[in-house]
Amino acid sequence: MGKDVIIACDFASKEETLNFLDKFTGKKPFVKIGMELFYAEGPQIVKDLKARGHKIFLDLKLHDIPNTVKKSMAVLSKLDVDMTNLHAAGTISMMEGALEGLTRPDGTRPLLIAVTQLTSTDQERMENDLLIKEPIDKVVMHYAHNASVAGLDGVVCSPLEAGKVHETCGEKFLTVTPGVRFADGDIGDQKRVMTPAEAKKIGSDYIVVGRPITAAADPVKAYERCCDEFIG
């Protein structure tokens, strides 16, 4: 898969999700299914969207003991998603177990991406809430390195860190970047953001965009604007 815009379908129900996606006549955008929608609708929402032709990033951010994550990933691998993720803070052994569980008997598997630090986290929150005193960019690079050592395909990171991740882990190591907003848009609860054009320039491989598309007066037009700015 090449560069792409992933729409964060952070809706509460299947009905809302399908009503939104029905607006994209003739288009099958890459979509992210997060906790709210997955927990509300279960695995069937993944099957339904796959049947409609969408690529899917299943964003559940697993973080548990290695054996539990391994077994959970073995279940998720049967859903035929295109990408899924976990928290890099779960350690290298957890990530290795996840990769093993996700790999099917024929050797195929979805892309596995590690979350470094959430884009809602800034230096102050990291120091005060998590008692991590290192600079946030150093923590992100450390987590990215660990994910690379574990054999993962890439990381979720702020677009501010995508270039450094490629420098640290190589150009083929994927960067999936939320925290993307239009220059004339509201940044919401994100702390570390860039525009689609800036994310392209700095080297992001995928951008995850939610409210700037889903809450737009014309979501299709907003999606096309994202694609124009990011993919060209």
Residue map of PLM features:
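N-terminal amphipathic alpha-helix/helix-capping segment at the start of soluble metabolic enzymes
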Residues: 1-20, 162-170, 194, 228-232
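Conserved anion-binding
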Residues: 2, 68-72, 77-153, 161, ...
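Short, acidic/polar
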Residues: 12-24, 67-75, 134-146, 191-198
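Active-site-adjacent beta->alpha loops and helix N-cap segments on the catalytic face
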Residues: 14-16, 37-52, 64-74, 88-111, ...
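Structural motif
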Residues: 26, 52, 79, 150, ...
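Glycine-rich phosphate-binding active-site loops on the catalytic face of alpha/beta enzymes
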Residues: 79-92, 189-222
